[in-house]
Amino acid sequence: MIQYLNVFFYDIYPYICATVFFLGSWLRYDYGQYTWRASSSQMLDKRGMVIWSNLFHIGILGIFFGHLFGMLTPHWMYAWFLPVAAKQLMAMVLGGICGVLTLIGGAGLLWRRLTNQRVRATSTTPDIIIMSILLIQCLLGLSTIPFSAQYPDGSEMMKLVGWAQSIVTFRGGSSEMLNGVAFVFRLHLVLGMTIFLLFPFTRLVHVWSAPFEYFTRRYQIVRSRR
């Protein structure tokens, strides 16, 4: 039974989540554009919104790009200037800082959403569920740091890296690379994949519409009517 669950969650489940993530996002964009928004509640009440939102977004963006580089970049691309042990230490320190920022900001946003009557009235169940899951995932991520510290050579981290790269390159037997990995890492992986599974059904879809063109657009020319 344990072997079956291991194969399902770490060999099959990643592709289920990825399929729902991409296909669900595409279908929602095509058929539900009126729901494709961040639904900001800042106009309802600004108290605490700016600081909590900034902390949360800075932290979670740092975590996302840190995981993107750390998990998916082939080792040979950085081995000549960044040893595995140094990479793990950097991940623990910077990841820990970003995790704390995300946790503080996310907890503030969730508390505001639950206790502010005006904000609560415009909140949906998926809003509350996805924020709660993100906070739990953040706690799990922070709780992996002591386990990583037990392997200063980065060997535990490289098992996770090997698993992630095996998944994205469609190699079989990916679950075998997680043999001996602490349970908290396994739980962190499953919940992380579940977030991608739920992504198309929440307001997280606004991530796809990040205004990157703002940095390259032409300056607007404003002429007064005189």
UniProtKB/Swiss-Prot annotation:
Cofactor (UniProt): heme
Topology in membrane: Multi-pass membrane protein
Catalytic activity: nitrate + a quinol = a quinone + nitrite + H2O
Compartments where located: Cell inner membrane
Gene3D superfamilies per UniProt: Transmembrane di-heme cytochromes, Chain C
Enzyme Commission no: 1.7.5.1
Claim: Kinase is one of the keywords in the record: no
Subunit composition and interactions: Dimer of heterotrimers each composed of an alpha, a beta and a gamma chain. Alpha and beta are catalytic chains; gamma chains are involved in binding the enzyme complex to the cytoplasmic membrane.
Function text: This is a second nitrate reductase enzyme which can substitute for the NRA enzyme and allows E.coli to use nitrate as an electron acceptor during anaerobic growth. The gamma chain is a membrane-embedded heme-iron unit resembling cytochrome b, which transfers electrons from quinones to the beta subunit.
Protein name: Respiratory nitrate reductase 2 gamma chain
Naturally occurring in which organism (per UniProt): Escherichia coli (strain K12)
